[in-house]
A protein has these predicted regions:
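Membrane-embedded alpha-helical bundles of multi-pass transporters/translocases
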Residues: 1-372
Length: 372
């Protein structure tokens, strides 16, 4: 499409359709985690397996595309060839269908095994949604997820741009950074998550990951902006690799803690109201995060215009304004936004002992209900 207006309409419609389809799939997918098991640690292990696989497969797809589809041919950088993105879209669409069918077939037998409270069906969707926000812990986690969604939207939009123009990496180096740190992070989390779950409670792990993420965002890009790093050296590449590996590791651990805490909040809400609303709760949390992540994408585009990054410009030809803009938003800027999740993580008031007490009370209620 040559017309900017038509291109905007097409992109907007495509994003809305993709997000809608993703929501219809992800809400029951996430909510089912609260029904498969009611064990405190088992929920963390389940969320860990799901999150690790999601990160690993998602990033490997991008890395493989950079290596084999967007690689340099005849002196032309494949990232700047429009036709490559069409092929990339078709391949991803085919893979989404395959893995969705596998997921649906693998979890189908859990549908009849819902908790007894799940049988409640409300006739006022808005009322059901608002009732979930009476739970303070749920409100805090939703706000936390919304802030993280904004950070995710900005990062997803500007990460490739930052690698290309701020760090001046080629396609091969970028593909290594897309895959390598994620693989390292997934392996470390898979090996250490059991130990971390025994040492830390979920809310403690949530606070720790928020704090370490802020620290990790504040050291690398400022060093580059202040001229304290050599240009295009092996050392710089290793530092970028380590920085992104830490970032991904903290993100995975935080997602595991958040999803597992949401499953516990479903129990807490059921005890308080007599209604089991895991679908509504996970839908509200997921929609809020994705809604704000959309604003992250909206912010990133005008931001690139603001700092003066022109379409098609080569990495070595950008101005210092572009470099400073990218460095500030992808480092201190994101750290500033991370203060919101950090604040919310300290307001969450949950514990292992509290969850055991909730499960015990629910069991006793179910026994009394069956006996009557």
């Amino acid at each position: 499409l040559d017309d900017q207006g038509e291109l905007f309409i097409w992109l907007l419609a495509s994003i809305l359709l993709v997000r809608t389809a993703l929501t219809f799939f992800m809400v029951p997918y996430l909510a089912l985690g609260a029904e498969i098991t009611d064990d405190y640690h088992e929920r963390s292990r389940l969320a860990g397996m799901r999150t690790n696989l999601g990160w690993f497969i998602g990033i490997m797809a991008s890395a493989m595309a950079l290596m084999f589809l967007f690689n340099e041919e005849n002196g032309v950088d494949g990232r700047f060839v429009i036709d490559n993105y069409c092929t990339y879209g078709w391949i991803n669409g085919f893979l989404v269908i395959i893995f969705s069918v596998i997921c649906i077939a693998g979890t189908w037998h859990y549908i009849p095994k819902l908790a007894s409270g799940a049988a409640h069906v409300g006739n006022n969707m808005l009322g059901e949604l608002m009732s979930t926000f009476r739970n303070k812990n749920f409100r805090y986690l939703v706000i936390l997820d919304m802030a993280l969604g904004g950070i995710g939207g900005i990062t997803a939009t500007l990460l490739m741009v930052t690698y290309t123009y701020f760090w001046k990496l080629n396609a091969t180096e970028t593909s290594v950074l897309f895959a390598g740190p994620v693989v390292a992070a997934v392996i470390i989390v898979a090996v250490c998550s059991g130990y971390l779950n025994r040492v830390f409670e979920k809310q403690q792990l949530l606070r720790l990951t928020c704090l370490l993420t802020i620290i990790n965002l504040l050291w690398l890009t400022p060093l580059k902006l202040l001229g304290l790093l050599p240009d295009n050296s092996t050392l710089v590449f290793i530092l970028i690799y380590a920085n992104w590996a830490i970032q991904v590791m903290m993100s995975i651990l935080r997602m595991i803690a958040t999803q597992s805490l949401l499953a516990d909040i479903v129990d807490e809400h059921e005890l308080a109201t007599g209604k089991r609303q895991e679908g509504v709760m996970f839908a509200a949390a997921f929609f809020s995060a994705k809604f704000i992540s959309g604003f992250g994408y909206l912010v990133a585009g005008p931001f690139l215009d603001l700092i003066g990054l022109e379409a098609g410009v080569q990495p070595g030809d950008v101005s210092r304004t572009v470099l400073w803009g990218l460095g500030l938003i992808m480092g201190p800027g994101l750290a500033l936004i991370m203060l919101v999740p950090m604040w919310m993580s300290f307001k969450v008031n949950m514990s292992h002992a509290g969850q055991l007490a909730v499960r015990q009370a629910l069991t006793e209620r179910a026994i009394r209900s069956d006996s009557s």
